[in-house]
Amino acid sequence: MIPRNFFFTILICAFNVCATFTAVATASPDCIGPFASYALFAFVTCICVCSIVCLVINFFQLVDWIFVRIAYLRHHPEYRNQNVAALLRLI
């Protein structure tokens, strides 16, 4: 089974992006000054970039987990260690 932390990380990134876009959608540019609008734009950009980086790292971890699982399952059964498999959540 795929570890739950992959799903939690994806959900946290999606929640951050959605919450940020919701906050920006309700902000009126006529009511805030130029510095505040630039600060808001920088905040939104930072959250989006951090979420994308987090998703890329999560994707690489998932690919690594799949390759480790394939390499483990290709070994002969007598060389498989159940403790290692349980530790890596491979089975």
Swiss-Prot record:
Family to which this protein belongs: Belongs to the adenoviridae E3B family.
Transmembrane segments: 35-60
Source organism of this protein record: Human adenovirus B serotype 7
Function: Down-regulates the EGF receptor.
Membrane topology field: Single-pass type I membrane protein
Subcellular location: Host endoplasmic reticulum membrane
Leader peptide range in chain numbering: 1-22
Topological domain ranges for the Lumenal compartment: 23-34
Cytoplasmic compartment segments: 61-91
Keywords (A to Z) from UniProt: Early protein, Host endoplasmic reticulum, Host membrane, Membrane, Signal, Transmembrane, Transmembrane helix
Name this protein carries in UniProt: Early E3B 10.4 kDa protein
One Gene Ontology term, aspect cellular component: host cell endoplasmic reticulum membrane
